[in-house]
Curated annotation (Swiss-Prot):
Belongs to the isocitrate and isopropylmalate dehydrogenases family. NAD(+) binds at residues 80-91, 290-301. Its EC number is 1.1.1.85. It comes from Maudiozyma exigua (Yeast). This is 3-isopropylmalate dehydrogenase. The keyword Transferase does not apply. Its cofactor is Mg(2+); Mn(2+). GO terms for cellular component: cytosol. InterPro entries: IsoCit/isopropylmalate_DH_CS (IPR019818), IsoPropMal-DH-like_dom (IPR024084), Isopropylmalate_DH (IPR004429).
Amino acid sequence: MAQTTKHIVVLPGDHVGQEITEEAIKVLNAISSVRPNVNFDFQHHLIGGAAIDATGVPLPDEALEASKKADAVLLGAVGGPKWGTGSVRPEQGLLKIRKELQLYANLRPCNFASDSLLDLSPLKPEIVKGTDICIVRELVGGIYFGERKEDEGDGVAWDSEKYSVSEVQRITRMAGFLALQHNPPLPVWSLDKANVLASSRLWRKTVEETIKNEFPTLTVQHQLIDSAAMILVKNPTHLNGVVIANNMFGDIISDEASVIPGSLGLLPSASLASLPDTNTAFGLYEPCHGSAPDLPKGKVNPVATILSVAMMLKLSLNMTEEGIAVEKAVKQVLDSGVRTADLRGSNSTSEVGDAIAKAVKEILA
């Protein structure tokens, strides 16, 4: 069988970013050890605070150019109090790479990697059992990229929210595609604030028309964002399916959802530049948690980053079997009790990574 090389740019970022990306690479190397026809080529570059310290900018040109040429990008975490809220901030590197690479769709699953984790949720197990939501957030438009005015001494500041029909159609098509990958198709929920905001009224109208005209077998239900935030806590399974939201609403609701499984260290994410209809969409993959500057070395949970690699394998690298194997390995390891402290365990970051890598080899052997 012909040798295939997958080119992956690794952006460890700040604080725990280095540790978690090392464990993710460990799992990918475990795959190549039992799939000799596949080789992973890793290129490491700076982003965030580490890049500011070394180069003065949060996203060096060489990191961006390398990312553009890669099959996928693996990101650790960026930010920390060291860099404050000055004019040059680590988070600017994230916003820039999303915009430059046109990573318009952020996918954040909210589910339980194993039912053995149900007791860790801040909600009652009987309420959260069966939660299976994929939040699809529009990532390169809206208020985060709109015109703005800072307070220049006059005591006035403002931000603007703007969406076009084409932007809303594009993210709706992503949600529709993902819903159709299941049999029966998943329901689609669209979150907005159409009772107040003009941009939300355009959003709702465009989502409705796009689903009706292009995905006639799907159902779409519209929910006001504040109501959805309450439902997510009271009865999260009610929102099971694909949830679509604009940039700011998606940012907030996905962070709320991330608390349901009991630890931010469990949840992966993917940011895609196109539909994964051939399993080769270009994407950036990262855990949902931050850089955890106060966490001692060896304590961070690598599961979210490793599950992000599972998404990468399935959506960008056309290695669905291997991606599923990683998910199975994570479940096996968690069920065996090998866990970091955030999951009431006593294992180190590298011990969890070692156990998952070993399980992946056994599953694929």
